[in-house]
Curated annotation (Swiss-Prot):
GO cellular component terms listed in the entry, alphabetical order: nucleus
Subcellular location: Nucleus
Positions with biased composition (Gly residues): 25-39
Identification of the protein by name: Helix-loop-helix protein 1
Listed Basic residues bias regions: 66-78
Amino acid sequence: MMLNSDTMELDLPPTHSETESGFSDCGGGPGPDGAGSGDPGVVQVRSSELGESGRKDLQHLSREERRRRRRATAKYRTAHATRERIRVEAFNLAFAELRKLLPTLPPDKKLSKIEILRLAICYISYLNHVLDV
């Protein structure tokens, strides 16, 4: 089967950056004139919040540049750091739980993450061998 990129459509949910503008706390939905834009790449801002030059600058920015500016805010960086910290803590907790299940001498020996994974592979292989015999 041949795939043609012209006819292939992907049914993917929109990403966070495509569904929310950097100004989502400015009132959401419709723009200042009461009509929402159908283009997800257009950022809508109240005219009272930006000066004339600010509005012109924002309109001419590409979607990528608006995304970069939004990610540069302290609020975004703090939220991202919090999410990353939670992810790393969950990751480390999973390694600690796996480590408790591995028989080693001495039992309290500190192992790196790669050592934990390699020992887990060996131990699972050993248990499979024991079951096969």
